[in-house]
């Protein structure tokens, strides 16, 4: 009876929007009203109405539906670290609003859509496209960064309609970034749906048989080098490695020049877990901007800061969502910490090393210096990657001992699987296997259209070394095939037996060769190799790795939602005249 009374008060000013509300079918208020409410209203007075807010291109507002639970205010303030939302007024006049009618300026704003228990905050891009009970739901893993956030893909027919977070307290808790959530329209645009071959300077569509024949003619008797991009599953990389080994070719995954050690797993994963941040008392960021490189990871650092952890930074000054003290901007500042007898870190301290420090000429020296710092204070190290496929590729040895330049040196043919962020040599034949008509496809002589991460099952190893399984939610468009299947078909034409004919056989082979990858959702302990620090060859400051959070891969670049968001962010960053 008490709950019935509370429900009556909650519904006094609530509009009867359920038939047209996007929250219908998954609305907390709707469920509670059905369970504890009554089927009629005794309220005869005029209902309150509120003006809708403009929070930007992602979050749609219907403030008349708001029940003033303040979840959105608490999230933006406590988790996202911005003070742009609040509650004004008292009693019946109270309402949620934004400060000076500003739009939200955070990479995590989409999470308030999930937190809202009613239909006051909904997704603008998803508005009126589907009902929740029409959608087929599939568990998967995000590949927009290397954190490995757990996600749910909601499909209607062959299209991904929306992407939602899944709870995993060890990785992303219950949050995902806006890039993860709103990249789904990029899965439909600029897609490669048929094979192409370059003839007379033009790419012309051909059959699979013709494309494979062209590739065989290009490869036979030639030196081949293989490279992979950021979004490729570990199984596909392993299949490519097997093919390259059979053809006596070279291969490399560190296309950005990142100086990650080939035989030292502790040097490219570290010895800390993401969850260790919660109990840390000092966090040192070196050559990284986690707010851009991994917004959900950055929210975890903010959580530690709220719990009393002190944040320190070595690198360029960046706009983070918490206070930090700057210890310097470059390499020599790491060495100064090692030699500073007054500088103390406890064993609960964590050093986070980013790609802005590693993807440079003396990145190996930086890594060894940081390992020396870890050994000096007996603290922990976590390498923050930006590529979802990088750790898995490193684990299976998809590397050249001397890096990307030596791997490509003298190659007649380059087999490029999903790599669009690196300029390839112009004096060789390029076979591009990918899902989107991006930079890699423009450079290609032969194109194999492949599935993207939502269209094939695969394992991704995240930045802390945790293997996670992403399940297929829908099928690739047109004649596009799964990555591993294309490599298997090509190997058959080249009479190079890879020993598998199905994904399960490929996974069995992979698990036999690298047993730790079979332990899904577990972090295998890495042997710590002592530092070999001998000084730096340069004194340059560290650089920012990413300039544009919303354009880091071909799927994101194809997304109209993210492109519009990128433009609005750039406009917000412009210097304005004072009013």
Please give the residue ranges for each predicted region:
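Alpha-helical structural elements
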Residues: 4, 31, 128, 170, ...
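N-terminal export/assembly segments and adjacent metallocofactor-ligating motifs
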Residues: 1-341, 356, 549-579
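Non-catalytic alpha/beta scaffold blocks inside enzyme catalytic domains
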Residues: 251, 255-520, 576-579
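Long, low-complexity segments enriched in small/aliphatic residues
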Residues: 505-579
